[in-house]
Amino acid sequence: MSASLAIPPSRALVWLKRDLREHDHAPLVAALAHSDALSLFIVEPEWLQSPECDTSHVDFALGCLAELRTALAARGMPLLVRIGSAVDVLAQLHNEVAFTHLLSHEETGPGWSYVRDVQVMAWCKSVHIHWQEFTQTGVVRRLRSRSGWAGRWQARMDAPLQLLNGEFTAAVTLNQPELPTLASLGLAPHGKTLQAAGEKAARRTLKSFLQVRGYDYRKALSSPLTAEESCSRLSPHLAFGTLSMRTVHQATEVAIANTPDRAFAYALRGFAGRLRWHCHFMQKLEDEPDIEFHNFARVCDGLREDEFNDAYFAAWCEGRTGYPMVDACMRSLIATGWLNFRMRAMLVSFASYHLWLHWRPTGLFLARQFLDYEPGIHWSQMQMQSGTTGINTLRMYSPTKQAQDQDPEGLFIRRWVPELARVPLPYLAEPWKMDISVQRIAACLIGVDYPAPIVDDKVAMKAAKDRMYGLRKSEGAREEASDVQARHGSRKGGLPPSGQRRKTTSLQTTKRVLKRATEESTTPSPQGDLFA
């Protein structure tokens, strides 16, 4: 080939975000086709300052990056970690190494990340950088209809894994300083006991679930006692991308096919079905980004916003509502960053119905506590459990019944609410029913050692039902329900119809999302000083 026909050199930059893994990573595989390559993770101030970010999230990400940097270095790929706004960091790095292609996975994130991506796209166009994004979940961009969505999901999940089959040529020799630490980022220790970070830990967790722990999955997932061991515990790894959804799906299908135990196969099929729901809820945010900030059903606007009780909110955040199961679950979540789904739903239901708190402040608090915070799932579930979708069944949990059903021996409550350690079991779910003599024997004076119930269970539940069902019977609510159903409601088979992603980025949309993201990053939230 003559010199005039030679292919010009191309330099790829792999932009890592919530895909902190080596295996089944399409951007890394694509980078092998370029002359040379390097990778980058950006610690963005917009992330650190966002109201849903917690130090534990940063800590987990740094742990993932430490392992990934070593793995990529063994293949000749440098991994840079830089601090700053995305466009600023990319522009500076472009000046240093003149990369020609930007490779990354698609992301369905909170408002600030969408605004960031719009800005990065504009910058890439201005300097003639080709930015290629790859899918990594079942979420479909610019989706016009949910018809066929299940087939697309299945096709993506059944496609061959994207595995690295070669070595990289390092772009240039760059100084790679040590990874930042929480201290160097100005972040205080979080004090949580977190799951192990990184792809190796993720694979161990997946293996143990599919081989042993998942046997009682269907029976054990509702109780916080048994769910801790019998749930997959993969959610943080899916959230930070140390495992791909496709890897989990295919490994699960292999395990189902290979086990001779029909009961185990049945349990794993239940888990496999939830993988598709994972992407289904993410699709809701992809289709309608405003659900992070606004009610699905706008007829619910004003329902709770003007009645926010700061004292109730503080008690709920701190696990001192006087309802033992609520308090035990909240304290456990704060300490570990994880809680099983039913108990998460109970916490939200109690806040939304018993305490009549709006889902946005409570959702931000929980987002910071959940190590596995996934925006699409989180905000969809916050609204479902708060009754503001306009179409889903109203789920109102009795904290007393949940204690009796899910912690019948009181082991979970006694572990996380030590004030109740000596309370007799018949009173443990409702300690306020002890007479004073029993309280003294149990060393638990209600109102002194442990709070009295913050609200009356039956009175609060009745008031919430009256308001919610009254609203749903209104003409406006019925009319809007049809529209919400068309955009987000479930079809037969559990695959709901959906609207379409913003196909183009209008200036008005960008300004609105940017304004909301900026306001909530700079304005102290009402819960901001409780768990810094």
Question: Where are each of the predicted segments found?
Answer:
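Active-site "lid/cap" and pocket-lining segments within catalytic core domains
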Residues: S2-A272, M282, T389-A532
